[in-house]
């Protein structure tokens, strides 16, 4: 009876005196599990959607968190079984309590290191997104090869950081930009850590640009939406200033204050690049383009070849009247690759002279407006 009474007293002393630490360990372990799940969810999202690679420090932390959670849960089970055992001594409780305090500090310390601004990095496959465009098709690159090659060369030299592509709508600016973007990704980024595509258009929305950039660089913090524009810019600058990036801005109508958005200016040290498309030479000046590339309309011979490729040479030559009208239709495209490809493909199913004459009439009375990439 005395022995049982002593064990009961021992348990009462432990439960009464040390229960706070048990509660703290339970709480800290649950909080660590929640944080671990949040980090893993972020990592998996970027790995699955953008084929990025988790940072080594994040992987190490996840392993440490898993081990700490497992050991803490085992310790809590042991404590529960020990407190219900009649054979437990005051000495064994003291030993367990020392281990409990040590484990509590470990769990809290690991939890304190679980806040990551960035959880992923370039895996060598691509941190950007392939833009939708069948850029390997010959019918789309006729007349654009030289410009695409020139932009690509600018991407490989250190003395040109900002490149502006300008020309009238439909001349193929977005198509060239798409080609370079996809080529970078196909070449495993060619030394760039981030490849970022932003569609700008009219009425510049700096916040939208910041949100697009932060998604591409792997920054996903719950507090992002509550940050001010300046705070967002600071986070973007903090990350991009340490990495080499290629930023593609499509359809720029007016100056975009990239410094205000948090984008570090490209220079010979960071070797980053900013490439944008615009209809205006003036915008090129305002954006500080070090290299300006004007895209011209195609000369007639190349325009006619591009049109025939898309309409189908057999159809174009199938009837003398079709050939004559086809040349007039192609001329209405005014040397614009986008118009030549789009209308050419639309005419590929027209096999009678009358269908071609009808199309020519429509083009003559209601000329379409072409802009965007050649798809």
UniProtKB/Swiss-Prot annotation:
<dbReference type="InterPro" id="IPR002182">
    <property type="entry name" value="NB-ARC"/>
</dbReference>
<keyword id="KW-0547">Nucleotide-binding</keyword>
<feature type="coiled-coil region">
    <location>
        <begin position="17"/>
        <end position="49"/>
    </location>
</feature>
<keyword id="KW-0067">ATP-binding</keyword>
<keyword id="KW-0611">Plant defense</keyword>
<dbReference type="GO" id="GO:0043531">
    <property type="term" value="F:ADP binding"/>
</dbReference>
<dbReference type="GO" id="GO:0005524">
    <property type="term" value="F:ATP binding"/>
</dbReference>
<dbReference type="Pfam" id="PF00931">
    <property type="entry name" value="NB-ARC"/>
</dbReference>
<dbReference type="InterPro" id="IPR027417">
    <property type="entry name" value="P-loop_NTPase"/>
</dbReference>
<protein>
    <recommendedName>
        <fullName>Putative disease resistance protein At3g15700</fullName>
    </recommendedName>
</protein>
<feature type="binding site">
    <location>
        <begin position="167"/>
        <end position="174"/>
    </location>
    <ligand>
        <name>ATP</name>
    </ligand>
</feature>
<comment type="function">
    <text>Potential disease resistance protein.</text>
</comment>
<dbReference type="GO" id="GO:0005829">
    <property type="term" value="C:cytosol"/>
</dbReference>
<dbReference type="InterPro" id="IPR050905">
    <property type="entry name" value="Plant_NBS-LRR"/>
</dbReference>
<dbReference type="InterPro" id="IPR042197">
    <property type="entry name" value="Apaf_helical"/>
</dbReference>
<feature type="domain" description="NB-ARC">
    <location>
        <begin position="158"/>
        <end position="372"/>
    </location>
</feature>
<keyword id="KW-0175">Coiled coil</keyword>
<dbReference type="GO" id="GO:0006952">
    <property type="term" value="P:defense response"/>
</dbReference>
């Amino acid at each position: 009876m005395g022995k049982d009474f002593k064990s009961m007293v021992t348990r009462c002393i432990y439960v009464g005196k040390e229960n706070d630490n048990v509660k703290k360990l339970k709480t800290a372990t649950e909080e660590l599990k929640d944080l671990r799940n949040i980090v893993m969810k972020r990592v998996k999202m970027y790995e699955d959607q953008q084929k990025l690679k988790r940072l080594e420090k994040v992987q190490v932390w996840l392993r440490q968190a898993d081990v700490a959670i497992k050991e803490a849960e085992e310790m809590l089970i042991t404590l529960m079984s020990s407190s219900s055992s009649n054979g437990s001594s005051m000495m064994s409780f003291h030993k367990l309590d020392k281990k409990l305090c040590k484990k509590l500090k470990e769990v809290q310390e690991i939890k304190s290191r679980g806040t990551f601004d960035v959880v992923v990095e370039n895996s060598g496959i691509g941190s950007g997104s392939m833009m939708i465009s069948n850029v390997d098709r010959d019918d789309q690159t006729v007349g654009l090869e030289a410009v695409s090659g020139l932009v690509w060369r600018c991407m490989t030299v250190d003395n040109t950081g900002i490149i502006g592509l300008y020309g009238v709508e439909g001349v193929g600016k977005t198509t060239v930009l798409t080609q370079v973007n996809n080529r970078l990704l196909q070449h495993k980024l060619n030394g760039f850590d981030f490849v970022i595509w932003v569609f700008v258009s009219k009425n510049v929305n700096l916040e939208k640009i910041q949100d697009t950039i932060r998604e591409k660089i792997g920054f996903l913090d719950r507090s992002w939406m509550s940050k001010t524009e300046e705070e967002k810019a600071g986070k973007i600058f903090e990350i991009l200033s340490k990495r080499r990036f290629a930023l593609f801005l499509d359809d720029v109508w007016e100056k975009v204050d990239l410094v205000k958005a948090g984008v570090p200016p490209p220079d010979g040290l960071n070797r980053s690049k900013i490439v944008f498309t615009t209809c205006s030479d003036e915008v090129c000046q305002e954006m500080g383009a070090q290299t300006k590339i004007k895209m011209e309309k195609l000369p007639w011979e190349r325009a006619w070849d591009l049109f025939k490729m898309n309409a189908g040479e057999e159809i174009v030559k199938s009837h003398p009247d079709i050939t004559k009208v086809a040349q007039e239709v192609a001329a209405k495209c005014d040397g614009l690759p986008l118009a030549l490809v789009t209308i050419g493909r639309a005419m590929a199913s027209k096999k009678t002279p009358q269908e071609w004459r009808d199309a020519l009439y429509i083009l003559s009375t209601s000329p379409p407006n072409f802009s965007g990439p050649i798809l």
